Amino acid sequence: MEESQSKQESSTKVAQHEGQEDVDPTFKTKKLMEVELMKHRVQLERNLKLRTFPGARTKQVKEALYPLLTWSSKSKNLFQNFTKLLLFKKLCQRGSENLVRESWYPCVPEEEAHMIDIQDLFGPNLGTQKKPQLVIIEGAAGIGKSTLARLVKRAWKEGKLYRNDFHHVFFFSCRELAQYEQLSLAELIVQGQEVPTAPIRQILSHPEKLLFILDGIDEPAWVLADQNPELCLHWSQTQPVHTLLGSLLGKSILPGASFLLTTRTTALQKFIPSLEQPCQVEVLGFTLFERKNYFYKYFGKKKGGVTTFTLVKSNSALLTLCEVPWVCWLVCTCLKKQMEQGGELSLTSQTTTALCLKYLSLTIPGQHMRTQLRDLCSLAAEGVCQRRTLFSESDLCKQGLDEHAIASFLKIGVLQKQASSLSYSFAHLCLQEFFAAMSYILDDSEERHADMKNDRIVETLVERYGRQNLFEAPTVRFLFGLLSKEELKKIEKLFSCSLHGKTKLKLLWHILGKSQPHQPPCLGLLHCLYENQDMELLTHVMHDLQGTIVPGPDDLAHTVLQTNVKHLVIQTDMDLMVVTFCIKFCCHVRSLQLNRKVQQGHKFTAPGMVLYRWTPITDASWKIFFSNLKLARNLEELDLSGNPLSYYAVHSLCTTLRKRGCQLKTLWLVECGLTSTYCSLLASVLSARSSLTELDLQLNDLGDGGVKMLCEGLRNPACNLSILWLDQASLSDQVIAELRTLEAKNPKLLISSTWKPHVMVPTMNMDKEEVGDSQALLKQQRQQSGDKHMEPLGTEDEFWGPTGPVTTEVVDRERNLYRVQLPMAGSYHCPSTGLHFVVTRAVTIEIEFCAWSQYLDKTPLQQSHMVVGPLFDIKAEQGAVTAVYLPHFVALQEGIVDSSLFHVAHFQEHGMVLETPARVEQHYAVLENPSFSPMGILLRMIPAVGHFIPITSTTLIYYHLYLEDVTFHLYLVPNDCSIRKAIDDEEMKFQFVRINKPPPVDALYLGSRYIVSSSKLVEIIPKELELCYRSPGESQLFSEIDIGHMDSEIKLQIKDKRHMNLKWEALLKPGDLRPALPKIATAPKDAPSLLHFMDQHREQLVARVTSVDPLLDKLHGLVLSEDSYEVVRSETTNQDKMRKLFSLSRSWSWDCKDQFYQALKETHPHLVMDILEKLGGVSVKS
């Protein structure tokens, strides 16, 4: 018990020092080790700087360092604790300098980007399937990049990460490397190791097993150019550090080595001109769970962790700011100081700037120290301008900091001394940038020289950060925050000074004026405005946002872009909070849409903004989002469709809607995961005299109970709603009647679904006369249908609609052409094909099953897209069909496949067109007001995944009974009606009969292999099946199971090959075998009564003819011309040769096919005999 308590206290102390180095609660667990190590490091550093590094001394240093390295057992939890940083793997192209989240438009479409874990940093690149040699970790200041980099090194050392990928991992702080003028490769490697692990020659002998971690690559003022790629110096020869690093990154030295870089900026091309295409990973900070976990570690759960985190949770803005690990440390430090001073715990800060000022007020003890603080601010500003983060003792003295002041700043944690050198640095780079911004505020220039001073400050900032990235710089954001009226008062109180407020405020306008006036507004500017929070400034700047319109993500999908709508990509809760805060002051934004994916949403009727986000939104952020919106008095339309909303989030939304100041008129909540539980909240809004006039609740499972609660709100006289979009197909007749009654009593109220399937639309006959009875029109259409031979299909192929089943008729079985005559307006669904039509009037629809191979092989899309559904050629009267539901077999419930990857391919005379569906549902992609041509669903492939995606599949079992012997054919295929039909037709030719058994319940994966087994000892060939997609015109994979005499039941099973988990099983009984043979498919009238042997056994011949060339030699001159002979022989495999031969046989006469049969009997007699024996010795027209 005591030992456990001691461990907890030790962990708490470590966490409290964490922010001073790298936002890591268990960082530097062995301070004593560092002190000893530093003694050797200091001497090593002196040798490097003096350029005296004899080989014997190097060996001695290595031997001396090695025994000192011991790791605390507490570091074992580090890997577990910090894998929860949100990592977002991006796909930006090289040369694209705008970070997605920093611009009004993404540099590339982001559908392929995704969240990853730390183990996946060096995973295969999307598109190449190769592991990257260069990974760039990017992110905002204080977000945890350095923590992640150090974690990779430590986890590798402990054998938990990349141990098989890299034999040696070297960690470098670029701020420290920049202190050296010259280094050799050997010296660099010594710098990157805690202790030497092998001789330098051995290390360099396998460059592909080396990982160099360069932390803060963009911090020093250097250009890492590979100046002379052809000159390869010996590893012991020295060269300028920037040249050495440039040669490594440019692959002139150790071309097989891998690199992990951390940086704030994505515009690395100016620092590293030879940089190759990297894998870019953005760190998005802490999840909500990790924020709580951080507080528990810092204070100890029982010693204040719960109390402090509860306090922070009560301030939603502060909780959101804490997604940045550095801010978490800052908040914890402030609360700890309050505890030590015995004051009441209180933290009301809404911005990072206010939090930093609170930190200063709590940590700087007296007026003397505050005077010294001015000098520290000057040091910080000088370092920012010169891109320096390490300072010598003489640098501090030059700024007027004496030993006592230095010691005091070290004690309170503002400064820290580097363990590996004699240098000093600020506790965090963000803290240095805050002090730098403070130095500009504390400048004592006379008022008459203020404009000149402001110009000089802005020029310095522009020179340091560049115009394009000016608003991304923390120094500039802190400046905006410090120049708010409220914060200026705090500064005056803190430093007991008087600041010229109006003069200082001019600095903001100088910054805004000097930045590119025609540059599209960026997310960084909104962050600056949020830090300032001045209403006048915000109103003025946000008023100008409407001046620049730029393409949005929808434009990338070739859709029509609304020119009055702005598009902004956000990634974090903090981004969302900042944007919605600023929107309150933008009078032009009257519509707002928040999408979790880049997809087409509702079209706005007023100027608006679309926000795109790929990570989930927390309840705390929803609360801030909605509380900001209640103050946005110009906002009229809000579209949250597709965002999963918790009960807490909907409660926050409804609280906002009930406020009198909320002017929202239109609210779209389509597919938000709402249930009947939420309806009481929504009903309270309807009866609260809210301004809401239109509400869309489609694609939510509200149920009868939920809709009844909505009806209570609709009956309230205070309800202003005029349009309610509501799915009614699943509602009971009683509830639908209640809705109709409400409409009848309130003529201004319309309750409907988007498709209005129950509405009867008057139709016109050929003479333009209105036909009221749609049955009469149906009769007329039947009379006009022509003289084609038609026959009804079975009941499973019927369409089910408002009046019950509608029969589907066969127009041309050989072409797979069918016709259905829908008798009235409504919704019709065919269970067999999965097709679903919504029509406005009676209409005749023709449906032809097509093979993808006929169309897709002619396009380049087969490399980038994959088929995920059947291909139909649909013909219908224009305008009669308002929606078509095309089936797909992707298992969306697995959460792996993004619905924005779905496209509908239209094959037209002038080429192929890809259309984005209106929405993608569990089994369908929906097209609204469709135009018809051969069409089906394609899925854009993510190269790293390829075809390996979860799908709904089906098993097809067929049997053939010969005397008393039974043979089964077992197929495992995607749940595609066209494939099922093609297999049915093929098996029917061989007189096999299908047995219906349930399909696999769980999703299976395309590209995976599965093992077929039986409860009895039977012959199964092959025993392994691959789940793959093959076009209906191609032969499908199946296992043949020879049972022999079946006198008892038998169980068939399918297991995945990798884990041998059971995926499907079926029990076959003797009673399943029907004695009657299936009828032979009707052949065309002018065709022979039966198929030729060659056509009847095409599939087996393709699969089983093992020697094609002798067969071709016998056909040469008789059936095959010289050109045809060479075309077939040019194919690489026997199966491809046979397929090519069969493609040529389409034009052959019956005599030519007889020639083929004779040649086959001579070259493959045993194969022919085996086929004939299975048919009972009957040869068909041979």
Curated annotation (Swiss-Prot):
Q: Where is this region: Disordered?
A: 1-23, 780-806
Q: Which PROSITE patterns match?
A: CARD, FIIND, LRR, NACHT
Mutating N975S: effect? In strain: PWK/PhJ
Residue span of region ZU5: 799-932
The record, for Pfam families, names: CARD (PF00619), FIIND (PF13553), LRR_6 (PF13516), NACHT (PF05729), NLRC4_HD2 (PF17776), NOD2_WH (PF17779), UPA-FIIND (PF23679)
| InterPro entries according to UniProt | CARD (IPR001315), CARD8/ASC/NALP1_CARD (IPR033516), DEATH-like_dom_sf (IPR011029), FIIND_dom (IPR025307), Leu-rich_rpt (IPR001611), LRR_dom_sf (IPR032675), NACHT_NTPase (IPR007111), NLRP_HD2 (IPR041267)
Q: What is the effect of changing L664I?
A: In strain: PWK/PhJ
Keywords for this entry?
ATP-binding, Cytoplasm, Hydrolase, Immunity, Inflammasome, Inflammatory response, Innate immunity, Leucine-rich repeat, Necrosis, Nucleotide-binding, Nucleus, Protease, Repeat, Ubl conjugation
Q: How is its activity regulated?
A: Nlrp1a inflammasome is activated by pathogens and other damage-associated signals: activation promotes ubiquitination and degradation of the N-terminal part, releasing the cleaved C-terminal part of the protein (NACHT, LRR and PYD domains-containing protein 1a, C-terminus), which polymerizes and forms the Nlrp1a inflammasome. Nlrp1a inflammasome is inhibited by DPP8 and DPP9, which sequester the C-terminal fragment of Nlrp1a (NACHT, LRR and PYD domains-containing protein 1a, C-terminus) in a ternary complex, thereby preventing Nlrp1a oligomerization and activation.
Which principal EC class is assigned to this enzyme? hydrolase
**What range(s) does the FIIND domain occupy?**
799-1082
Gene Ontology terms: cellular component: cytoplasm; NLRP1 inflammasome complex; nucleus
Q: Where are the LRR repeats?
A: 634-655, 691-711, 720-743
* Impact when changing K337N: In strain: PWK/PhJ
In which compartments does the protein localize?
A: Cytoplasm, Cytosol; Cytoplasm; Nucleus
Q: Consequence of mutating R1030Q?
A: In strain: DBA/2J
* Entry EC no(s): 3.4.-.-
- Recorded family membership: Belongs to the NLRP family.
- What's its job? Acts as the sensor component of the Nlrp1a inflammasome, which mediates inflammasome activation in response to various pathogen-associated signals, leading to subsequent pyroptosis. Inflammasomes are supramolecular complexes that assemble in the cytosol in response to pathogens and other damage-associated signals and play critical roles in innate immunity and inflammation. Acts as a recognition receptor (PRR): recognizes specific pathogens and other damage-associated signals, and mediates the formation of the inflammasome polymeric complex.
The Swiss-Prot or TrEMBL note on domains reads:
The leucine-rich repeat (LRR) domain may be involved in autoinhibition in the absence of activating signal, possibly through intramolecular interaction with the NACHT domain.
**What else does the entry mention about this protein?**
Three tandem Nrlp1 paralogs, Nrlp1a, Nrlp1b and Nrlp1c, are present in at least 2 strains, C57BL/6J and 129S1/SvImJ. Nlrp1c is predicted to be a pseudogene. Nlrp1b is the primary mediator of macrophage susceptibility to Bacillus anthracis lethal toxin (LT). Neither Nlrp1a, nor Nrlp1c are expressed in anthrax lethal toxin susceptible strains, hence neither of them is thought to play an important role in this phenotype.
Q: How does this chain assemble?
A: Interacts (via LRR repeats) with BCL2 and BCL2L1 (via the loop between motifs BH4 and BH3). Interacts with NOD2; this interaction is enhanced in the presence of muramyl dipeptide (MDP) and increases IL1B release. Interacts with EIF2AK2/PKR; this interaction requires EIF2AK2 activity, is accompanied by EIF2AK2 autophosphorylation and promotes inflammasome assembly in response to danger-associated signals. Interacts with MEFV; this interaction targets Nlrp1a to degradation by autophagy, hence preventing excessive IL1B- and IL18-mediated inflammation.
Q: What is this protein called?
A: NACHT, LRR and PYD domains-containing protein 1a
Its source organism is Mus musculus (Mouse)
Instruction: Write the gene name.
Output: Nlrp1a
